[in-house]
A protein has these predicted regions:
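ALDH superfamily catalytic-core signature
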Residues: 254-396, 418-421, 460, 505-507
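Residue-level signal for inorganic ion chemistry
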Residues: 47, 84, 106, 192, ...
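Terminal low-complexity tails and localization/encapsulation signals of metabolic enzymes
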Residues: 1-53, 86, 90, 138-171, ...
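Glycine-rich loop-to-alpha-helix module at the N-terminal edge of alpha/beta enzyme cores
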Residues: 50-140
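Rossmann-like NAD(P) dinucleotide-binding subdomain of oxidoreductase/dehydrogenase enzymes
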Residues: 140-290
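Short, well-ordered beta-strand elements within core beta-sheets of diverse protein domains
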Residues: 49-56, 73-77, 169-170, 280-283, ...
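Structural signal for hydrophobic packing residues in well-ordered secondary-structure cores
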Residues: 72, 76, 92-99, 103, ...
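Conserved C-terminal structural/oligomerization subdomain of aldehyde/semialdehyde dehydrogenase
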Residues: 48-51, 244, 281, 335, ...
Length: 507
């Protein structure tokens, strides 16, 4: 019998952290929410309440923005780029030093396996902060030669400066809390912006812990503020606030559209990383063992609660049966259990509502005639667990092939000896365009298919390659803009052009 989360050991520090009713972090202080509302935090592996948070109101968001504005115009503006680098590197080091507590908190309020929690902290959170720390000293403008017809026959100097936009808002999803926090925090700090952050109200624990580390790192008060709360309250207040100059959001397409509407009031910049329904295209010469494990990771990483998930598997007919047999064999043997159990490979879904939503798609797949190869059941035990699920043999118009499920459900279908444009057209039959992958030993085929797939990121012989330096974002209904890499700095910056006239023109 697998151990339960209640019986698995967690550190004394984690237990102490969980025992608190957590306040808001505004202007470097832990303050009570004006709403007086609290929310219990639930462990999705046990359905037990493990901690409690206070919920921010619109007034609390206002206070956070005021603090962020004051810091932006005050002490933070006086800290040079070299000093920002040192502060960010200190924060990254503190995250690594606190990896045990952070990983335990991430497992307990999100449900992912411990191995993945540790990886998202050391392989994503701290690394993203270090990467962008290196950019602090490399953000610069240009000098621009101007035409004689423009100003003073060349007797002038025109230059540009890249300046921080000001206070930025970040709305963090629940599926990868600390990684998403870091990838939004890092470019904001690197560019000299200040922040108001709303974590998902059901997974706020690692963000709350990171605020302690922000303070310990010496980042000035007011630079980073955290307002846990409901999306329709705190999230809406951030999106519409006239003094927030840019919002970064990761989440559903429907909520992203609402954020765009809310941002119209002051025409703030908006970056959106939204839904996905990514294709995985497998050609007959592909390494079948690599494809098998690649498809498993693509579909079931983070229990399928992953915007980049490769949930549409297209396999050439010559190897389709073998690939499906292999994938089903691995999926059906995956160990499902609480993330604190080191043997667990697949944790619970985030909530009862999310599991019900995913199970409704499983039923829709059956009703629309798709063949269920494996899985399709929720587990009869405490926790929001369900089996990894594989469907095949249905047309592309079924719901499970079209709509983002955000759970461990994979739909596979064969393709024949069509030209690459026809195969790509099938892969592109989606309102989304976030990620995708191509599996082949023929590099020419891989590169051609990568160019034809309409997604913001395509990988060849792997799926969803992620690195701080690789720009990431979606096409179509998968979002606006790019995060990561140099492009990830752009939304946090504005360009100011200045011209100095040395002499008056002779006319």
């Amino acid at each position: 019998m697998s151990a339960t989360a209640e019986t698995l050991a967690i550190s004394t520090e984690t237990r102490e952290f969980l025992s608190r009713t957590h306040k808001l972090f505004i202007n470097g202080q832990w303050v009570d929410a004006t709403s007086g509302e609290t929310l219990g935090i639930i462990d999705p592996a046990t359905e037990a309440q493990i901690s409690e948070i206070q919920l921010a109101s619109t007034d609390d968001v206002d206070k956070a923005v005021i603090a962020a504005q004051a810091a932006f115009k005050g002490e933070w503006s006086k800290i040079n780029s070299h000093q920002r680098t040192k502060l960010m590197l200190k924060l990254a080091d503190l995250i690594d030093e606190n990896i045990q507590t952070l990983a335990e908190l991430e497992v307990l309020d999100n449900g992912l396996p411990m191995m993945l929690a540790e990886y998202t902290i050391s392989g994503y959170a701290s690394d993203f902060i270090r990467y962008y720390a290196g950019w602090c000293t490399k953000i610069h403008g240009d000098t621009i030669p101007v035409s004689p017809a423009g100003v003073a026959n060349g007797e002038s100097l025109t230059y540009t400066r890249r300046e921080p936009v000001g206070v930025v808002g970040a709305i963090i999803p629940w599926n990868a809390p600390i990684a998403m926090l870091a990838l939004k925090l890092a470019p904001a700090l690197a560019t000299g912006c200040t922040m108001v952050i709303k974590p998902a109200e059901i997974t706020p624990l690692t963000a709350l812990k990171v605020m302690e580390l922000v303070k310990e790192a010496g980042i000035p008060d007011g630079v980073v503020n955290l307002v846990p709360g409901y999306g329709e309250v705190a999230g809406a207040a951030i999106s519409s606030h006239p003094d927030i100059k840019k919002v970064s959001f990761t989440g559903s397409t429907a909520v992203g559209q609402k954020i765009v509407e809310a941002a119209l009031g002051n025409l703030k910049k908006v970056s959106l990383e939204l839904g996905g329904k990514s294709p995985v295209v497998v050609f007959p010469d592909a390494d079948i063992e690599a494809v098998t494990m690649g498809a498993i990771r693509a579909a079931f990483f983070l229990q399928g609660q992953n915007c980049m998930a490769g949930t549409r598997l297209f396999v050439h007919q010559d190897i389709f049966d073998q690939v499906i047999q292999n994938v089903a064999g691995v999926a059906s043997q995956m160990k499902i259990g609480p993330g604190l159990d080191p043997s667990s490979q697949l944790g619970p879904l985030i909530s009862a509502d999310q599991r019900s939503r995913v199970m409704s798609y499983v039923q829709a797949g059956k009703d629309e005639g798709a063949e269920l190869i494996c899985g399709g059941n929720q587990l009869d035990r405490k926790g929001f667990f369900m089996e990894p699920t594989l469907f095949t043999h249905a047309h592309q118009d079924v719901k499970i092939a079209r709509e983002e499920i955000f759970g461990p459900v994979l739909f596979a279908q064969p393709f024949g000896d069509s030209d690459l444009e026809t195969i790509a057209a099938e892969a592109n039959k989606s309102i989304y365009g976030l990620s995708g992958s191509v599996w082949t030993k023929d590099i020419a085929v891989g590169l051609k298919m990568a160019s034809l797939i309409d997604s913001g990121q395509v990988s060849v012989n792997c799926h969803a390659a992620v690195d701080p330096a690789i720009p990431f974002g979606g096409n179509k209904m998968s979002g606006w803009g790019r995060e990561f890499g140099q492009e990830g700095l752009e939304p946090y910056l504005k360009t100011k052009a200045t011209t100095v006239l040395f002499s008056q023109p002779p006319f």
